[in-house]
Amino acid sequence: MESVAYIVVLTMALAVLFFAIAFREPPRIQK
C-alpha cells in the first residue's frame, strides 16, 4: 500500500505545480 500513498503524493505535488503555474501566468487557454 506504500505505492498507493506515493502515487497520491506525486499527484498532489503535480496538481500544486500546475495550479501555481496556471494562476501565476495570465490565462491564455480559454474555450
From Swiss-Prot:
GO CC term (a single one): plasma membrane-derived thylakoid membrane
Query: Which HAMAP family does the UniProt entry name for this protein?
Result: PSII_PsbT
Family label: Belongs to the PsbT family.
UniProt xrefs under PANTHER family: PHOTOSYSTEM II REACTION CENTER PROTEIN T, PTHR36411
Self-association state and partner proteins as the record states: PSII is composed of 1 copy each of membrane proteins PsbA, PsbB, PsbC, PsbD, PsbE, PsbF, PsbH, PsbI, PsbJ, PsbK, PsbL, PsbM, PsbT, PsbX, PsbY, PsbZ, Psb30/Ycf12, peripheral proteins PsbO, CyanoQ (PsbQ), PsbU, PsbV and a large number of cofactors. It forms dimeric complexes.
Protein purpose: Found at the monomer-monomer interface of the photosystem II (PS II) dimer, plays a role in assembly and dimerization of PSII. PSII is a light-driven water plastoquinone oxidoreductase, using light energy to abstract electrons from H(2)O, generating a proton gradient subsequently used for ATP formation.
Q: What is this protein called?
A: Photosystem II reaction center protein T
Task: Supply the source organism for this entry.
Answer: Crocosphaera subtropica (strain ATCC 51142 / BH68)
Top-level taxonomy = Bacteria, Bacillati, Cyanobacteriota, Cyanophyceae, Oscillatoriophycideae
